[in-house]
UniProtKB/Swiss-Prot annotation:
Species this chain originates from: Caulobacter vibrioides (strain ATCC 19089 / CIP 103742 / CB 15) (Caulobacter crescentus)
Primary site of residence: cytoplasm
Pfam families (UniProt xref): SIR2
UniProt name for this protein: NAD-dependent protein deacylase
Name of the encoding gene: cobB
Compartment annotation: Cytoplasm
Gene Ontology MF annotations: histone deacetylase activity, NAD-dependent; NAD+ binding; protein-malonyllysine demalonylase activity; protein-succinyllysine desuccinylase activity; zinc ion binding
Domain of life: Bacteria
Entry annotation: catalytic residues: H112 (proton acceptor)
Ranges for domain Deacetylase sirtuin-type: 1-237
Reactions catalysed according to its record: N(6)-acetyl-L-lysyl-[protein] + NAD(+) + H2O = 2''-O-acetyl-ADP-D-ribose + nicotinamide + L-lysyl-[protein]; N(6)-succinyl-L-lysyl-[protein] + NAD(+) + H2O = 2''-O-succinyl-ADP-D-ribose + nicotinamide + L-lysyl-[protein]
Amino acid sequence: MRGIMKVFVLTGAGVSAESGLGTFRDKDGVWTKYDLNEVATPQGFARNPALVRDFYNARRANLAGARPNAAHDALAQLEAGLARRGGELFLCTQNVDDLHEKAGCRRVIHMHGELAVTRCHHCEATWPDTGPLKPDTVCAACARDGGARPHVVWFGEIPLFMDQIEDALSAADLFVSIGTSGSVYPAAGFVAEARAMGIATCEINLEPSANAYVFDEKVYGPATEVVPAWVERLLARL
C-alpha cells in the first residue's frame, strides 16, 4: 500500500445501518414499506406533497437521534491520518444523513443530497433545516410557498457533483466502496472506471455486493468491526 496518498471512499447505507438508520434494499429496508414512486419521485411530490413531507419528516426525526458509529469515526481518522502524511481522502457518500460530518469528517460530497437541507421546488434554492417540512414555508429566495421539499436526489433526478466526483476518482490511488449494494448507478460504475484507469480497488461490506467480482480486494463483516481494522492496517502501511 506504499505510494497510496489519495484515497477515494464511496459509502452507502451499510455504513449507517448500525447507527439505527435503515437501509433501503434489504428485506426489511425502507422500500419494502413504501412505494418509491409515491415518496421518492418528482411526480409523487406533485401528486401528494403531504405524503412525501410526512415520509421525510419521519426520516428527519429518526436522523436527529442517530449518532456516528465506529465506521464513521474510523473514516474521520483516515482523513486526518492521510492529511498528516500529505495525502488526501475524498469521501463521497450515497447517504443523505450527516453522520460523517458528526464524526469529524471535514469534506463530504453528498451525491444524493442531504436530508437536513430543504430545497425550494420552485427556484432550487437550498437552506439548512432539521425541522419538519411544512406546506406553508416561504422560500427566502423567491418568496413563494408550497415548494419546500427535502434536498435529496429522487429517482429520475441527476446525482449531484458528478464532475467533481469524476475528477477526484481519476486522481485517486485507491478506490474503496463501503456498505453499498453495487446496484445503484452511476455510483455502482465507479469501480469499473477505477479499474480501467489502473487504480487499486477494495470492497468493504457486510456481504458481497452485486459487483463484488470487479474489486481487487474484498473485506466482509459488520462495518463497525471491519472498517476500523482496515483503516488501522492502511495507515500503518503508509
